[in-house]
């Protein structure tokens, strides 16, 4: 065994350790013990590891490692998603960058798909390499790609079964259409935001010389206008769509227009007659109370059109240009050019009544940012009502638990208001819909293959069949992930991959932002297709934001690559990474300036363990999680402290050969074993409740404060004392507790704990070859009658802390011997002083410990109190009192000036000052006040 390095350098061992673990097969399911399964939300094959991935994967890996150490048969199912739209966009962009003139359309379907597979082979394993660097302990031999043959067969099977159940149907419906991608997208892929626009009012002439009496009143009901009109005024935010109007509508109880219901108006610019219909949908109080109806280009109008059996006129091509259904002079115009042309003609005709500014909700595609067009087209849909009813039952009856439970309300609302799911996409990359059309008759046949279709429907070779060109949206295959990865529907593959053993999985860890995209659909699909729940628990994580609470995004230039935190990156490389390939080049200078200010020296290497521990510590149950680099630096220091504590232990146990649990001889040993039992119990509780933040906190407190700061200190008197038995027992306990601590920390910080454990294991006679297969500590391992020792040592710690604080306040040199005088106190204090006198003298550098007699006056001294016991450190000979008074007076004056500056700053802050800046100054003021109070207290003692 090589000697432990003198300094903590994670780069020197992390990669080697991972390779050794993987080579030894430690990540594969054992096949014995209770199964514990986690599904990795499959990252897009287009992607690289980002902080969201690192966050969730760290928590998943901690759970997998924890349960593996507890003897569970662990399976972490990993893989990647083909990501239809995202991948087509990336490959199309790469083709353009290559400059060979090749495009998606010029290559054709087969040629383009070939290019996608080439690109997938080149870049598809990048994210898996990055996951390994983070420490992901997954069985990579089972890694699955959603376009692999097995999951592709599952997709076809699911489609056919749902079609045969009547759940899948094909129909002409209004969908969200992205004119850049030229495909339908789901409601969940549409982002609506308020934007500035206009509301145009247009006159529609009544047919057959009809007229009505138009009356206007002010807010008080006073009549301001009365006239006879032969036209209706209709307001719209999209005047170009009037070319596709098939009705105007009024409220059935609106007396103003009652006699016009069933009559007609002449559609401007077209001369077409369209009916005046009545529908409760109309808001009589808005505008004139007359609404145009364009069923093919508005979702609400579509429902009206269905209710009234109105014609549906599709005005647009797939790229949102006007088609042959528009008057010839408008055909071929882009929708916005058409808007200008329509408005110009309306104005020339004198029927553009009014134009006014208007705020409106504009829907845009989340990938392209383009305005989405409601578009009438043939698509494939899944009927969701019955699936959703059952999916909601499984959560509400407790079959599946949500953590935190408040997400049930969000889930319930969506499931109760669910719409049929449009599953077809007009793309090439993806699972092609298993449906074939008879070229001659147009008849549609669904089956697992063309051969099956021909056999089932007795179609000879003379019948020409063409497969549906559309592919299924990515989430259709993703919803099958819990069981397609376990071999379904192939019975042999299901047996080989442990379908019955590993389904349902134990927990799904995912972001709340895909509760509808993925979580709900997995619940519904798994229940319907295999009669099981997909998972027992769902733990929803918050979204990772930067230190200021901003969403991390490429456009903001605030993205942190987890590998840069692990391995470090220079400032120039970081700037290049953040500014390269920006969609808005004007942001480059701003992003570079902000980056150089935040990271003037780049990002130092922190190692995987420090990042993982940071993530665990930040994993609260809130919606948003601010990633703070200072926390990462702090946990790197934590790893360094653990390293140095291990070096101390190893140096003091050279040649040791212990077995089993030590028989503690000192109170310090009994105390640390008692604390070890408590923290082991607490840690298991936090794992059970998915409280990774509290887990990290309790382990940090035990490792840093109780083991490193206190037990190592309290062990020194025994290690350096005359009692050989005490020294030997303490050495055994040092090794034993450190080994248990490494086991406690291992799921969160696997690399450093394994590296240190390899040094300790031989000295404890342990048979295992790796820490990852050691049992996770339980309180029962360390049980003993330690209550009195724990109370005694807590008292000892309080005394040591109090005297050290006095020494520090008096600026007494650490090496200087001082006397300690004791006054008052209880009988128990006297017993404890006697018991711990050697430890106190050793640790506090005391040259004497004396009790003052009852009634004896105390010498001039700095005092501290622990319970009823007064601790006195005589001042004579320790400090130059006059010089110390002068020093403290100067320091008090300096801090008072800084305090006043801070108060003045806060008083002058306005509402325009960022809240983070205000909070930072408030923290400074608190710090100045704390310093000032401490200095004044010291001055009073002199």
UniProtKB/Swiss-Prot annotation:
Binding site for ATP: 554
Location in the cell: Cytoplasm
GO MF: aminoacyl-tRNA deacylase activity; ATP binding; valine-tRNA ligase activity
Motif ('HIGH' region): 43-53
EC number of this enzyme: 6.1.1.9
Quaternary structure note: Monomer.
UniProt-recorded name of the protein: Valine--tRNA ligase
UniProt organism field: Stenotrophomonas maltophilia (strain R551-3)
């Amino acid at each position: 065994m090589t000697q432990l390095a003198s300094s903590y350098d994670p780069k020197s061992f992390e990669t080697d350790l991972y390779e050794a673990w993987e080579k030894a097969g430690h990540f594969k399911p054992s096949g014995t013990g209770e199964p514990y399964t986690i599904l990795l939300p499959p990252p897009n094959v287009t992607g690289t590891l980002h902080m969201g991935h690192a966050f969730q994967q760290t928590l998943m890996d901690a759970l997998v490692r924890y349960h593996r150490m507890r003897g569970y048969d662990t399976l972490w199912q990993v893989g990647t998603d083909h990501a239809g739209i995202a991948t087509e966009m990336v490959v199309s962009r790469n083709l353009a960058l290559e400059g060979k003139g090749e495009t998606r359309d010029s290559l054709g379907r087969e040629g383009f798909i070939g290019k996608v597979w080439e690109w997938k082979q080149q870049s598809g394993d990048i994210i898996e390499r990055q996951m390994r660097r983070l420490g992901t302990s997954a069985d990579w031999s089972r890694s699955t790609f959603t376009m692999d043959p097995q999951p592709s067969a599952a997709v076809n099977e699911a489609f056919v079964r749902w079609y045969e159940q009547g759940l899948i149907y094909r129909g002409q419906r209004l969908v969200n259409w992205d004119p850049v991608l030229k495909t339908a997208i789901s409601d969940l892929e549409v982002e609506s935001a308020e934007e500035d626009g206009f509301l145009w009012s247009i006159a529609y002439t009544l047919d057959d010389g009809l007229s009505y009496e138009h009356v206007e009143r002010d807010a008080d009901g006073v009549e301001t206008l009365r006239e006879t009109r032969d036209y209706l005024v209709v307001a719209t935010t999209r005047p170009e769509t009037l070319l596709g109007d098939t009705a105007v509508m009024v409220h059935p109880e609106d007396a103003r227009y009652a006699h016009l219901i069933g009559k007609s108006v002449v559609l401007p610019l077209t001369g077409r007659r369209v009916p005046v219909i009545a529908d409760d949908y109309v808001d009589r109080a808005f505008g004139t109370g007359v609404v145009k109806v364009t069923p093919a280009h508005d979702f609400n109008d579509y429902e009206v059109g269905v209710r009234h059996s109105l014609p549906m006129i599709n005005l647009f091509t797939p790229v949102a240009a006007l088609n042959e259904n528009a008057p010839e002079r408008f055909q071929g115009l882009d929708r916005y050019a058409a808007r200008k042309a329509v408005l110009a003609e309306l104005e020339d005709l004198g029927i553009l009544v009014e134009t006014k500014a208007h705020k409106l909700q504009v829907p845009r595609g989340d990938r392209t940012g383009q305005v989405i067009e409601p578009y009438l087209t043939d698509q494939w849909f899944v009927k969701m009502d019955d699936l959703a009813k059952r999916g909601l039952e499984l959560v509400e009856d407790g079959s599946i638990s949500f953590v935190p439970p408040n997400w049930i309300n969000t889930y319930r609302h969506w499931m109760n208001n669910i719409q049929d799911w449009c599953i077809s996409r007009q793309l090439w990359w993806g699972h092609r819909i298993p449906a074939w059309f008879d070229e001659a008759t147009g008849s549609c046949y669904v089956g697992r293959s063309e051969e099956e279709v021909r056999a089932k429907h007795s179609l000879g070779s003379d019948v020409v069949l063409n497969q549906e060109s559309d592919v299924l949206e990515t989430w259709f295959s993703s919803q099958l992930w819990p069981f397609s990865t376990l071999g379904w529907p192939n019975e042999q593959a299901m047996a080989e991959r442990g379908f019955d053993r590993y389904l349902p999985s134990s927990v799904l860890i995912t972001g709340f932002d895909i509760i509808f995209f993925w979580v709900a659909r997995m619940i519904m699909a798994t229940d319907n297709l295999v009669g099981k729940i997909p998972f027992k628990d769902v733990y929803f994580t918050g979204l990772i934001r930067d230190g200021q609470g901003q969403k991390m995004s490429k456009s903001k230039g605030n993205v942190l690559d987890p590998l840069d935190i692990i391995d470090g990156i220079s400032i120039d490389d970081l700037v290049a990474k953040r500014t390269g390939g920006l969609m808005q080049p004007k942001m480059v200078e701003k992003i570079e300036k902000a980056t150089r200010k935040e990271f003037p020296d780049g990002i130092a290497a922190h190692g995987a363990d420090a990042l993982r521990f940071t993530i665990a510590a930040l994993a609260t149950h809130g919606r948003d999680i601010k990633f703070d680099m200072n926390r990462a630096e702090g946990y790197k220091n934590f790893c360094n402290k653990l390293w140095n504590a291990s070096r101390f232990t190893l140096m003091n146990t050279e040649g040791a050969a212990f077995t089993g649990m030590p028989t503690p001889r000192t109170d310090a040993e009994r105390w640390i074993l008692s604390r070890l039992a408590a923290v082991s119990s607490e840690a298991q509780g936090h794992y059970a409740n998915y409280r990774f933040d509290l887990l990290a906190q309790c382990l940090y407190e035990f490792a840093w404060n109780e083991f490193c700061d206190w037990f190592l200190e309290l062990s020194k008197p025994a290690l350096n004392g005359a009692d050989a038995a005490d020294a030997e027992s303490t050495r055994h306990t040092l090794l034993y507790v450190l080994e248990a601590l490494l086991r406690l920390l291992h799921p969160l910080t696997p690399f450093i704990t394994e590296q240190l454990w390899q040094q300790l294991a031989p000295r404890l006679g342990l048979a295992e070859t790796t820490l990852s297969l050691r049992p996770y500590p339980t309180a029962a391992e360390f049980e003993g009658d330690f209550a009195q020792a724990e109370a005694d040592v807590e008292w000892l710690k309080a005394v040591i802390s109090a005297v050290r604080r006095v020494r520090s306040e008096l600026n007494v040199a650490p090496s200087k011997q001082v006397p300690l005088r004791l006054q008052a106190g209880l009988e128990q204090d006297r017993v404890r002083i006697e018991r711990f006198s050697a430890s106190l003298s050793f640790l506090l550098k005391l040259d004497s410990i004396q009790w003052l007699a009852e009634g004896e006056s105390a010498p001039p001294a700095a005092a501290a109190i622990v319970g009823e016991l007064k601790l006195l450190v005589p001042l004579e000979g320790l400090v130059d009192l006059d010089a110390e008074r002068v020093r403290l007076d100067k320091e008090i004056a300096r801090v008072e000036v800084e305090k006043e500056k801070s108060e003045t700053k806060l008083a002058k802050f306005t509402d325009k000052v960022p809240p983070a800046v205000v909070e930072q100054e408030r923290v400074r003021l608190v710090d100045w006040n704390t310093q000032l109070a401490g200095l004044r207290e010291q001055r009073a003692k002199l």
